[in-house]
């Protein structure tokens, strides 16, 4: 196997989704063992010695080998290991640790780089309940890993008889757990009979993208009785030639074409580790995650009358604010009046125009990008203050949480992204309304106001990222951008910027957010406008600025 020669020493950044690197370049055996030892150090310092570490991996080439390296280190540190017998979805690992092992669990190590291109690999750590690691944990792992790198302590102390891992496959219990959702707990229930009846004479296409989700939706749809057809159904360590197994445009062309060609009413896509979803409506129309989140919030909160916090990242559609205002008996799950989101309280946050209270949401909790921040919301007071001792049922305080990048979880569910569960919620919603997603979205916009959203990914050299972001803060100071007046501009210099703009008609429902990707060599720009004219003007400005680099 290539890539196991000694690696070049470099600081290790272990972020929201762990560590990611290219096989044989940044991602090598010494690096994986070093990070795993740092994780073990954290677990030992947290008093979890001797408990079970769940180790899984995704379907890409060599990921299973990386999982074996992790297993060696974890066993050498005296922990028991439950190693998955096949590539396994991230949410299924979270379920297994939090629901099956429960108090016996120490945490989850997952060898995945999620939706990234095939040459990229990753290692991610989740807490013993399946939660995404918060910053205090990822910072510890980063600092300890880098310290090991500098001192060349890259291997674990080995026990005399470390033992062997127990092989597990959580697919069957996880699928049954989803089917039983809401029957005996606070989770959201699915109406199997209505789904079976509505889809009886219809077809659903499932795009497994050669990933870990193979067989999961198939099992569940079979049991419910929903007719389906599967594409990209085989495990392919090279992901079938896909540039990235990422269920969004332009990577889901075959799903769009198959839905259109077969006359299917719905297409459901999963990424490599099945934590992201991709939705295609009849005729082959891709549905943006922002629209999916808005429709599900309407369905669950307004139509079904379920209550709980609605949590989203600050780059998600503002139509959510208007929908969440319509959820009855939900006042105790709304932000306290006038409370600022945590990212705008950061001492490095600079307001260059306007007042931050002009960007405050009254019905939706807004946080930084990443599910790890979304799952903090039900662990907060209404003023965004993190509780030292969250209530035991904190997961039940969330109604729905999601982000523009196809990540979603809901009331009582695993505290991580789950593309399989998101797909089932969409199926349940479509059966409830009895029509296409495009029609549901048109009706939602007619009720709550229209919005146009566009995510833009720009490849920008590292040395130009901070100046590029700061140029939009400068535009905020100047007071105009793309022919529109800047009402508000703020952010952390070099890290991100957010702007609210007023068009010539006096409409201020126009927003620009810009930040570097935490996992890819990209700058992400998110636009939301009230008109095509404003959208076209902003896109032209972004294109012009990118071309000038």
Language model features by range: what are they?
Residues 1-72, 76-77, 163-204:
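An N-terminal, well-structured beta->alpha segment
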Residues 81-91, 286-289, 312-313, 365-369:
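Active-site nucleophile and cofactor-binding loops and adjacent substrate-binding regions
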Residues 2-9, 121-259:
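Gly/Ser/Thr-enriched, mixed-charge loops and adjacent short helices
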Residues 12-25, 113-114, 208-212, 216, ...:
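Conserved phosphate/anionic-ligand binding catalytic regions in large, soluble enzymes, centered on
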Residues 120, 265-266, 306-549:
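Phosphate-binding and adjacent anionic-ligand microenvironments
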Residues 17, 55, 93, 109, ...:
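Buried hydrophobic positions in well-ordered alpha/beta secondary-structure cores of metabolic enzymes
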């Amino acid at each position: 196997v290539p890539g196991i020669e000694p690696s070049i020493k470099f600081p290790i950044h272990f972020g929201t989704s762990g560590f990611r690197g290219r096989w044989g370049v940044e991602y090598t055996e010494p690096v994986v063992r070093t990070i795993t030892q740092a994780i073990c150090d954290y677990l030992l310092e947290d008093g979890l010695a001797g408990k079970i570490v769940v180790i899984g991996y995704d379907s890409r080439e060599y990921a299973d080998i990386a999982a074996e390296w992790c297993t060696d280190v974890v066993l050498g540190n005296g922990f028991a290991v439950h190693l998955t017998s096949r590539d396994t979805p991230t949410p299924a690992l979270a379920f297994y640790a939090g629901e099956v092992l429960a108090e016996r669990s120490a945490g989850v190590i997952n060898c995945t780089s999620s939706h990234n291109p095939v040459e990229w690999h990753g290692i991610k750590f989740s807490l013993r309940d399946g939660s995404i690691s918060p910053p205090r944990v990822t910072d510890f792992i980063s600092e300890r890993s880098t310290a090991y790198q500098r001192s060349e302590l890259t291997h674990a102390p080995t026990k005399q008889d470390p033992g062997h891992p127990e092989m597990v496959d959580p697919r069957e219990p996880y699928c049954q757990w989803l089917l039983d959702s809401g029957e005996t707990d606070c989770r959201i229930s699915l109406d199997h009979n209505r789904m079976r009846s509505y889809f009886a004479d219809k077809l659903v296409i499932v795009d497994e993208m050669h990933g870990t989700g193979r067989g999961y939706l198939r099992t569940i749809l079979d049991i419910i009785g929903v007719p389906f057809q599967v594409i990209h159904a085989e495990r392919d360590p090279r992901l079938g030639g896909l540039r990235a197994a990422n269920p969004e445009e332009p990577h889901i062309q075959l799903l769009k074409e198959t839905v259109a060609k077969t006359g299917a009413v719905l297409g459901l896509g999963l990424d490599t580790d099945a934590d992201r979803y991709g939705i295609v409506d009849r005729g082959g129309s891709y549905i943006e995650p922002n629209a999916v989140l808005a429709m599900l919030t309407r369905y669950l909160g307004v139509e079904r009358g379920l209550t709980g916090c609605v949590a989203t990242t600050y780059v998600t559609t503002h139509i959510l604010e208007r929908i969440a205002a319509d959820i009855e008996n939900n006042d105790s799950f709304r932000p306290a009046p006038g409370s600022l989101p945590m990212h705008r309280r950061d001492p490095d946050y600079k307001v260059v125009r306007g007042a931050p209270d002009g960007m405050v949401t009254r019905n939706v909790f807004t946080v930084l990008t990443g599910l790890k921040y979304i799952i903090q919301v039900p662990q907060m007071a209404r003023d965004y203050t993190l509780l030292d001792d969250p209530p035991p049922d904190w997961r039940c305080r969330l109604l729905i949480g999601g982000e523009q990048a196809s990540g979603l979880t809901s009331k009582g569910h695993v505290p991580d992204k789950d593309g399989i569960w998101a797909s089932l919620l969409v199926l349940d919603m479509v059966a409830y309304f009895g029509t296409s997603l495009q029609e549901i979205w048109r009706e939602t916009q007619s009720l709550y106001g229209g919005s146009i959203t566009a995510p833009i990914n720009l490849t920008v050299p590292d040395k130009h990222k901070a100046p590029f972001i700061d140029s939009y803060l400068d535009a905020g100071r100047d007071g105009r951008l793309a022919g529109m007046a800047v009402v508000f501009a703020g952010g952390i210099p070099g890290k991100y910027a957010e702007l609210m703009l007023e068009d010539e008609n006096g409409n201020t429902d126009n927003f620009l957010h810009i930040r570097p990707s935490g996992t890819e060599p990209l700058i992400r720009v998110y636009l939301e406008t009230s008109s095509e004219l404003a959208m076209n003007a902003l896109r032209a400005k972004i294109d012009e600025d990118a071309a000038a680099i």
